[in-house]
């Protein structure tokens, strides 16, 4: 399996003490500027993009999980024939599911308040191979729907 982990780009959104969005690029504390939505300049945007794609590869992680699970849905056990595996994986016939979703980590009090905490939480827990599994599209929808239903019931009972 790959030693690289995935971190979604949105994990790097940063805010100053006043709650204003500041540039996501590491070490930059400037306020974002139009026309950019997450950066202060084109240079910062390009630097961050290069760093992000060099260090974090979601496609690679997904591929590792699909291979580990032998291109088989871990719930219904539907197995994709070898000749179709790459095609189905690419067309999203298979999906990589987070067993413990990000929203639950936040509810449990895990910290995403600094860049270091975001990277640590994401790489060590959220996108750890033990927290990922291969599901077919239908099973992934069912799992997500059930999680949302249980979450809604829990929220109502509080």
Placement of each model-derived feature along the sequence:
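Short metal-coordination and nucleic-acid-contact micro-motifs, chiefly zinc-binding Cys/His arrays
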Residues: 16-24, 36-37, 68-70, 92, ...
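Short cysteine-rich loop/turn motifs with clustered Cys
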Residues: 24-28, 59-106, 136-138
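Short beta-strand-alpha-helix junction that forms the catalytic/metal-binding core
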Residues: 73, 105-139
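Terminal non-domain segments
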Residues: 67, 108-111, 123, 153-157
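Short Cys/His-rich "knuckle" micro-motifs
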Residues: 31-39, 48, 52, 82-97, ...
